[in-house]
A protein has these predicted regions:
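Hydrophobic membrane-insertion alpha-helices, especially the h-region
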Residues: 5-17
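N-terminal catalytic scaffold of extracellular/periplasmic and nuclease hydrolases
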Residues: 19-187, 192, 197-213, 218, ...
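Active-site His/acidic residue clusters
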Residues: 153-158, 226-229, 245-246, 250, ...
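Functional beta-strand-loop-alpha-helix junction segments that form "active/interaction loops"
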Residues: 203-244
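Active-site proximal loops enriched in glycine and acidic residues that flank catalytic Cys/His/Asp
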Residues: 225, 265-269, 274, 286, ...
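Gly/Ser/Thr-rich active-site loops/lids in small-molecule metabolic enzymes
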Residues: 282-298, 330-343
Protein backbone atom coordinates (compact mmCIF):
# COMPACT_ATOMS: atom_id res chain seq x y z
CA UNK A 1 0.00 0.00 0.00
CA UNK A 2 2.82 2.39 0.91
CA UNK A 3 4.52 1.62 -2.42
CA UNK A 4 1.28 2.35 -4.27
CA UNK A 5 0.87 5.69 -2.48
CA UNK A 6 4.49 6.55 -3.25
CA UNK A 7 4.03 5.70 -6.93
CA UNK A 8 0.92 7.89 -7.18
CA UNK A 9 2.76 10.72 -5.39
CA UNK A 10 5.67 10.49 -7.81
CA UNK A 11 3.33 10.46 -10.81
CA UNK A 12 1.47 13.50 -9.47
CA UNK A 13 4.72 15.33 -8.79
CA UNK A 14 6.02 14.52 -12.27
CA UNK A 15 2.77 15.70 -13.88
CA UNK A 16 2.90 18.90 -11.84
CA UNK A 17 6.52 19.53 -12.85
CA UNK A 18 5.77 18.93 -16.53
CA UNK A 19 2.81 21.31 -16.32
CA UNK A 20 4.85 24.00 -14.60
CA UNK A 21 7.79 23.52 -16.97
CA UNK A 22 5.52 23.73 -20.01
CA UNK A 23 3.64 26.82 -18.92
CA UNK A 24 6.06 28.84 -16.83
CA UNK A 25 9.68 27.66 -16.89
CA UNK A 26 10.45 28.61 -20.47
CA UNK A 27 14.13 28.31 -21.37
CA UNK A 28 15.78 30.57 -23.96
CA UNK A 29 19.29 31.16 -25.24
CA UNK A 30 20.39 34.74 -25.90
CA UNK A 31 23.57 35.71 -27.74
CA UNK A 32 26.25 37.57 -25.81
CA UNK A 33 26.80 40.97 -27.41
CA UNK A 34 30.06 42.61 -28.42
CA UNK A 35 29.20 46.32 -28.42
CA UNK A 36 31.67 48.59 -26.61
CA UNK A 37 30.47 50.65 -23.68
CA UNK A 38 29.53 54.22 -24.55
CA UNK A 39 30.83 56.24 -21.62
CA UNK A 40 28.53 59.12 -20.72
CA UNK A 41 29.61 62.42 -19.22
CA UNK A 42 28.39 62.44 -15.63
CA UNK A 43 28.49 65.74 -13.76
CA UNK A 44 28.87 66.25 -10.02
CA UNK A 45 26.28 68.16 -8.01
CA UNK A 46 26.54 69.87 -4.65
CA UNK A 47 24.51 68.11 -1.96
CA UNK A 48 22.64 71.34 -1.30
CA UNK A 49 21.65 71.84 -4.95
CA UNK A 50 17.92 71.68 -5.72
CA UNK A 51 16.32 70.73 -9.04
CA UNK A 52 13.66 72.71 -10.87
CA UNK A 53 12.68 69.94 -13.25
CA UNK A 54 11.87 66.25 -12.75
CA UNK A 55 12.21 63.46 -15.33
CA UNK A 56 10.79 60.14 -14.14
CA UNK A 57 11.55 57.24 -16.50
CA UNK A 58 9.75 53.97 -15.88
CA UNK A 59 10.69 50.55 -17.19
CA UNK A 60 7.47 48.61 -16.82
CA UNK A 61 8.24 45.10 -15.57
CA UNK A 62 11.98 45.82 -15.39
CA UNK A 63 13.72 43.91 -12.63
CA UNK A 64 17.46 43.66 -12.06
CA UNK A 65 17.67 40.53 -14.20
CA UNK A 66 16.02 42.27 -17.16
CA UNK A 67 18.80 44.85 -16.83
CA UNK A 68 21.49 42.18 -16.41
CA UNK A 69 20.36 40.21 -19.46
CA UNK A 70 20.18 43.39 -21.55
CA UNK A 71 23.70 44.29 -20.45
CA UNK A 72 25.03 40.87 -21.46
CA UNK A 73 23.11 40.91 -24.75
CA UNK A 74 24.55 44.34 -25.55
CA UNK A 75 28.23 43.82 -24.79
CA UNK A 76 28.83 41.01 -22.33
CA UNK A 77 29.05 40.99 -18.53
CA UNK A 78 31.62 43.82 -18.38
CA UNK A 79 29.56 46.10 -20.62
CA UNK A 80 27.96 49.15 -19.05
CA UNK A 81 24.53 50.41 -20.06
CA UNK A 82 23.39 53.99 -19.60
CA UNK A 83 21.38 52.94 -16.54
CA UNK A 84 24.57 51.45 -15.04
CA UNK A 85 26.24 54.86 -15.25
CA UNK A 86 23.69 56.66 -13.11
CA UNK A 87 25.61 57.55 -9.93
CA UNK A 88 23.03 56.83 -7.22
CA UNK A 89 21.15 53.58 -6.69
CA UNK A 90 18.59 52.19 -4.25
CA UNK A 91 15.90 49.52 -4.06
CA UNK A 92 12.14 49.94 -3.93
CA UNK A 93 9.45 47.71 -2.47
CA UNK A 94 6.46 47.33 -4.78
CA UNK A 95 3.55 45.72 -2.89
CA UNK A 96 0.08 47.20 -3.26
CA UNK A 97 -2.32 48.19 -0.47
CA UNK A 98 -3.60 44.69 0.26
CA UNK A 99 -1.37 42.32 -1.70
CA UNK A 100 2.34 41.55 -1.97
CA UNK A 101 1.67 41.33 -5.71
CA UNK A 102 1.19 44.69 -7.41
CA UNK A 103 -0.08 45.63 -10.82
CA UNK A 104 0.97 48.74 -12.72
CA UNK A 105 -2.08 50.73 -11.62
CA UNK A 106 -1.40 50.34 -7.91
CA UNK A 107 2.33 50.86 -8.27
CA UNK A 108 2.00 53.98 -10.40
CA UNK A 109 -0.59 55.32 -7.96
CA UNK A 110 2.07 55.04 -5.24
CA UNK A 111 4.44 57.30 -7.18
CA UNK A 112 1.73 59.66 -8.36
CA UNK A 113 -0.06 60.20 -5.03
CA UNK A 114 2.18 58.81 -2.30
CA UNK A 115 -0.61 56.50 -1.15
CA UNK A 116 -1.04 52.78 -1.75
CA UNK A 117 -4.20 51.48 -3.37
CA UNK A 118 -5.67 48.16 -4.44
CA UNK A 119 -4.65 46.55 -7.71
CA UNK A 120 -6.54 47.84 -10.77
CA UNK A 121 -7.43 51.12 -8.98
CA UNK A 122 -6.01 54.40 -10.31
CA UNK A 123 -5.22 57.23 -7.89
CA UNK A 124 -8.39 56.95 -5.81
CA UNK A 125 -6.98 58.48 -2.64
CA UNK A 126 -8.28 60.65 0.23
CA UNK A 127 -7.09 63.93 -1.29
CA UNK A 128 -7.17 62.62 -4.86
CA UNK A 129 -4.18 64.54 -6.22
CA UNK A 130 -1.36 63.20 -8.38
CA UNK A 131 1.97 64.98 -8.87
CA UNK A 132 0.95 66.92 -12.03
CA UNK A 133 -2.21 68.11 -10.26
CA UNK A 134 -0.27 69.14 -7.15
CA UNK A 135 2.24 71.05 -9.26
CA UNK A 136 -0.22 72.62 -11.69
CA UNK A 137 -0.85 75.57 -9.37
CA UNK A 138 2.80 75.74 -8.29
CA UNK A 139 4.07 77.01 -11.61
CA UNK A 140 4.81 73.66 -13.24
CA UNK A 141 3.98 72.24 -16.64
CA UNK A 142 3.64 68.45 -17.00
CA UNK A 143 3.88 65.86 -19.76
CA UNK A 144 3.58 62.10 -20.25
CA UNK A 145 5.12 59.61 -22.67
CA UNK A 146 4.35 55.89 -23.02
CA UNK A 147 4.88 53.18 -25.59
CA UNK A 148 1.55 51.70 -24.45
CA UNK A 149 -1.68 53.60 -24.89
CA UNK A 150 -1.49 56.89 -23.02
CA UNK A 151 -4.58 55.63 -21.15
CA UNK A 152 -2.74 52.53 -19.90
CA UNK A 153 -2.24 51.98 -16.18
CA UNK A 154 1.09 53.71 -15.55
CA UNK A 155 0.52 57.01 -17.38
CA UNK A 156 -3.15 57.07 -16.33
CA UNK A 157 -2.25 57.11 -12.63
CA UNK A 158 -0.80 60.60 -13.12
CA UNK A 159 -4.13 62.14 -14.14
CA UNK A 160 -7.06 59.71 -13.78
CA UNK A 161 -9.09 58.83 -10.69
CA UNK A 162 -11.10 55.70 -11.35
CA UNK A 163 -11.88 52.28 -9.88
CA UNK A 164 -10.65 50.25 -12.86
CA UNK A 165 -7.65 50.67 -15.13
CA UNK A 166 -9.65 48.93 -17.85
CA UNK A 167 -12.17 51.78 -18.29
CA UNK A 168 -9.91 53.37 -20.89
CA UNK A 169 -12.54 55.49 -22.64
CA UNK A 170 -13.42 57.13 -19.33
CA UNK A 171 -9.72 57.49 -18.57
CA UNK A 172 -9.23 59.18 -21.96
CA UNK A 173 -11.96 61.70 -21.10
CA UNK A 174 -10.24 62.45 -17.80
CA UNK A 175 -6.95 63.13 -19.59
CA UNK A 176 -8.60 65.85 -21.66
CA UNK A 177 -9.79 67.54 -18.46
CA UNK A 178 -6.48 67.15 -16.61
CA UNK A 179 -3.61 69.65 -16.24
CA UNK A 180 -1.36 67.47 -18.44
CA UNK A 181 -0.25 69.67 -21.34
CA UNK A 182 1.64 67.11 -23.43
CA UNK A 183 0.78 63.42 -23.91
CA UNK A 184 2.56 61.16 -26.39
CA UNK A 185 1.75 57.46 -26.82
CA UNK A 186 -0.83 55.13 -28.30
CA UNK A 187 -4.54 54.79 -27.60
CA UNK A 188 -6.27 56.46 -30.53
CA UNK A 189 -9.23 54.08 -30.26
CA UNK A 190 -10.15 55.32 -26.78
CA UNK A 191 -10.58 59.01 -27.62
CA UNK A 192 -13.40 61.13 -28.98
CA UNK A 193 -11.32 62.76 -31.71
CA UNK A 194 -13.60 65.74 -32.21
CA UNK A 195 -13.41 66.50 -28.50
CA UNK A 196 -9.63 66.11 -28.59
CA UNK A 197 -9.33 68.71 -31.34
CA UNK A 198 -11.32 71.28 -29.36
CA UNK A 199 -8.37 72.00 -27.07
CA UNK A 200 -5.37 70.00 -28.35
CA UNK A 201 -3.08 69.77 -31.31
CA UNK A 202 -3.65 66.15 -32.33
CA UNK A 203 -0.59 64.43 -33.81
CA UNK A 204 -0.74 60.97 -35.37
CA UNK A 205 2.39 61.13 -37.53
CA UNK A 206 5.81 60.87 -35.87
CA UNK A 207 7.24 63.30 -38.42
CA UNK A 208 5.21 66.08 -36.80
CA UNK A 209 7.12 65.81 -33.50
CA UNK A 210 9.75 68.37 -34.47
CA UNK A 211 7.81 70.93 -36.49
CA UNK A 212 6.98 74.53 -35.57
CA UNK A 213 3.31 73.68 -35.22
CA UNK A 214 4.19 71.14 -32.53
CA UNK A 215 6.53 73.46 -30.63
CA UNK A 216 4.08 76.38 -30.72
CA UNK A 217 0.99 74.40 -29.67
CA UNK A 218 -0.43 75.17 -26.22
CA UNK A 219 -1.56 71.60 -25.62
CA UNK A 220 -0.55 68.45 -27.50
CA UNK A 221 -1.95 64.93 -27.69
CA UNK A 222 0.11 62.56 -29.82
CA UNK A 223 -1.63 59.25 -30.58
CA UNK A 224 0.51 57.05 -32.80
CA UNK A 225 -1.42 53.77 -32.77
CA UNK A 226 -4.87 52.44 -31.94
CA UNK A 227 -3.65 50.92 -28.67
CA UNK A 228 -0.02 50.25 -27.76
CA UNK A 229 2.56 51.45 -30.27
CA UNK A 230 3.69 48.68 -32.60
CA UNK A 231 7.42 48.78 -33.16
CA UNK A 232 8.11 49.80 -36.78
CA UNK A 233 10.04 52.44 -38.70
CA UNK A 234 6.83 54.48 -39.12
CA UNK A 235 6.11 54.64 -35.38
CA UNK A 236 7.97 56.70 -32.77
CA UNK A 237 10.14 55.05 -30.14
CA UNK A 238 10.29 55.93 -26.46
CA UNK A 239 13.54 57.74 -27.21
CA UNK A 240 12.03 59.85 -29.99
CA UNK A 241 8.91 60.76 -28.02
CA UNK A 242 10.85 61.58 -24.86
CA UNK A 243 13.31 63.78 -26.74
CA UNK A 244 10.41 65.64 -28.35
CA UNK A 245 8.68 65.97 -24.98
CA UNK A 246 11.79 67.42 -23.33
CA UNK A 247 12.20 69.94 -26.16
CA UNK A 248 8.56 70.98 -25.85
CA UNK A 249 8.42 71.13 -22.04
CA UNK A 250 11.73 72.94 -21.56
CA UNK A 251 10.81 75.44 -24.28
CA UNK A 252 7.41 76.15 -22.72
CA UNK A 253 8.83 76.37 -19.20
CA UNK A 254 11.48 78.89 -20.28
CA UNK A 255 9.14 81.01 -22.42
CA UNK A 256 6.49 81.27 -19.73
CA UNK A 257 8.71 81.73 -16.67
CA UNK A 258 7.46 78.50 -15.12
CA UNK A 259 9.03 77.13 -11.96
CA UNK A 260 9.85 73.95 -13.85
CA UNK A 261 8.45 70.88 -15.58
CA UNK A 262 7.56 67.29 -14.72
CA UNK A 263 7.87 64.51 -17.30
CA UNK A 264 7.00 60.84 -16.87
CA UNK A 265 8.18 58.54 -19.67
CA UNK A 266 7.44 54.81 -19.69
CA UNK A 267 8.97 51.97 -21.66
CA UNK A 268 5.77 49.98 -21.39
CA UNK A 269 6.51 46.97 -23.53
CA UNK A 270 9.45 45.56 -21.58
CA UNK A 271 6.63 44.28 -19.40
CA UNK A 272 4.64 42.89 -22.31
CA UNK A 273 7.62 40.91 -23.62
CA UNK A 274 8.28 39.61 -20.12
CA UNK A 275 4.65 38.51 -19.75
CA UNK A 276 5.16 36.59 -23.01
CA UNK A 277 8.44 35.12 -21.69
CA UNK A 278 10.10 36.50 -24.82
CA UNK A 279 13.65 37.43 -23.86
CA UNK A 280 14.74 38.54 -27.33
CA UNK A 281 11.89 41.05 -27.65
CA UNK A 282 12.45 42.20 -24.08
CA UNK A 283 16.06 43.05 -24.95
CA UNK A 284 14.90 45.07 -27.98
CA UNK A 285 12.43 47.02 -25.82
CA UNK A 286 15.04 47.56 -23.13
CA UNK A 287 17.49 48.97 -25.68
CA UNK A 288 15.01 51.74 -26.52
CA UNK A 289 14.48 52.33 -22.79
CA UNK A 290 18.23 52.55 -22.11
CA UNK A 291 18.80 54.87 -25.06
CA UNK A 292 16.10 57.09 -23.57
CA UNK A 293 18.00 57.11 -20.28
CA UNK A 294 21.24 58.03 -22.07
CA UNK A 295 19.54 60.96 -23.81
CA UNK A 296 17.99 62.11 -20.51
CA UNK A 297 21.36 61.89 -18.76
CA UNK A 298 22.86 64.12 -21.45
CA UNK A 299 19.98 66.54 -20.87
CA UNK A 300 20.72 66.63 -17.12
CA UNK A 301 24.44 67.16 -17.76
CA UNK A 302 23.64 70.14 -19.99
CA UNK A 303 20.67 71.44 -17.98
CA UNK A 304 21.91 71.19 -14.44
CA UNK A 305 18.60 72.06 -12.77
CA UNK A 306 17.01 68.72 -13.68
CA UNK A 307 16.73 65.57 -11.55
CA UNK A 308 16.47 62.27 -13.45
CA UNK A 309 14.92 59.23 -11.76
CA UNK A 310 14.61 55.75 -13.24
CA UNK A 311 12.68 52.88 -11.67
CA UNK A 312 10.14 50.14 -12.34
CA UNK A 313 6.65 49.38 -11.14
CA UNK A 314 7.48 45.70 -10.58
CA UNK A 315 9.41 42.81 -12.07
CA UNK A 316 7.64 40.61 -14.60
CA UNK A 317 8.30 36.98 -15.46
CA UNK A 318 10.63 35.86 -12.67
CA UNK A 319 13.53 36.02 -15.13
CA UNK A 320 16.63 33.99 -14.22
CA UNK A 321 20.03 34.04 -15.93
CA UNK A 322 21.44 30.58 -15.41
CA UNK A 323 24.59 29.75 -17.35
CA UNK A 324 26.79 30.42 -20.35
CA UNK A 325 27.29 28.07 -23.30
CA UNK A 326 29.84 29.28 -25.83
CA UNK A 327 28.60 32.71 -26.95
CA UNK A 328 25.08 32.41 -25.50
CA UNK A 329 23.50 32.63 -22.06
CA UNK A 330 20.74 30.35 -20.85
CA UNK A 331 17.78 32.15 -19.32
CA UNK A 332 14.62 30.79 -17.76
CA UNK A 333 11.30 32.38 -16.90
CA UNK A 334 9.49 31.48 -13.68
CA UNK A 335 6.04 32.89 -14.42
CA UNK A 336 3.96 34.71 -16.98
CA UNK A 337 2.93 37.29 -14.40
CA UNK A 338 4.48 39.81 -12.01
CA UNK A 339 6.67 38.98 -9.04
CA UNK A 340 7.16 40.74 -5.70
CA UNK A 341 10.91 41.19 -6.14
CA UNK A 342 12.15 44.70 -5.18
CA UNK A 343 13.19 46.86 -8.13
CA UNK A 344 16.00 49.34 -8.62
CA UNK A 345 15.79 53.12 -8.22
CA UNK A 346 18.44 55.11 -10.09
CA UNK A 347 19.09 58.85 -9.79
CA UNK A 348 21.22 61.55 -11.41
CA UNK A 349 21.20 65.30 -10.95
CA UNK A 350 20.66 67.74 -8.08
CA UNK A 351 19.04 65.94 -5.15
CA UNK A 352 19.91 62.48 -6.50
CA UNK A 353 21.97 61.50 -3.46
CA UNK A 354 18.88 60.85 -1.30
CA UNK A 355 17.60 58.07 -3.58
CA UNK A 356 19.70 55.33 -1.98
CA UNK A 357 19.04 52.39 0.34
CA UNK A 358 15.73 50.60 0.65
CA UNK A 359 12.56 52.62 0.12
CA UNK A 360 8.88 52.03 -0.46
CA UNK A 361 7.45 53.09 -3.81
CA UNK A 362 5.27 55.65 -2.01
CA UNK A 363 8.45 57.30 -0.69
CA UNK A 364 9.42 58.29 -4.22
CA UNK A 365 6.39 60.60 -4.43
CA UNK A 366 7.39 62.56 -1.34
CA UNK A 367 11.08 62.55 -2.22
CA UNK A 368 10.26 64.16 -5.58
CA UNK A 369 8.17 66.88 -3.94
CA UNK A 370 10.82 67.43 -1.26
CA UNK A 371 13.55 67.69 -3.92
CA UNK A 372 11.85 70.65 -5.61
CA UNK A 373 10.72 72.05 -2.24
CA UNK A 374 7.13 72.08 -3.46
CA UNK A 375 5.74 73.04 -0.07
CA UNK A 376 7.58 76.35 -0.29
CA UNK A 377 6.48 77.22 -3.82
CA UNK A 378 4.02 80.08 -4.06
CA UNK A 379 0.79 79.58 -6.03
CA UNK A 380 1.44 80.19 -9.71
CA UNK A 381 -0.30 78.97 -12.83
CA UNK A 382 2.17 78.34 -15.63
CA UNK A 383 0.11 79.44 -18.63
CA UNK A 384 1.56 78.48 -21.96
Amino acid sequence: MKKLVLIFALIAAAAYFVSINKNHLKVEYISIGTQPTKALEVASFDAAAKPKNIILIIGDGTGLNQITLSRIASGGPDHRLAIDQMPFFGNSLTHSYNNIYTDSAASATSWATGIKTKNKFLSITPDGKAIPEILSNKGYISGLVATSSITHATPAAFYAHIDSRYKEKEIASQLLESPIKLSLGGGLEFFDIEKVKESNLLITDMNDLDGDKFLKAKKVLGLFDEDGINRSSSKPTQLQMTKAALNWLSSKANLNSCNGFFLMSEGSQIDWASHDNDAATMVVEFKDFDQTIAMAMDFVTSNKETLLLVTADHETGGLQILSQKNDTVKVQWGTGSHTSIPVGVYAYGPGAHVFTGLMDNTDIHYMILDAIESSGLKPLVCSN
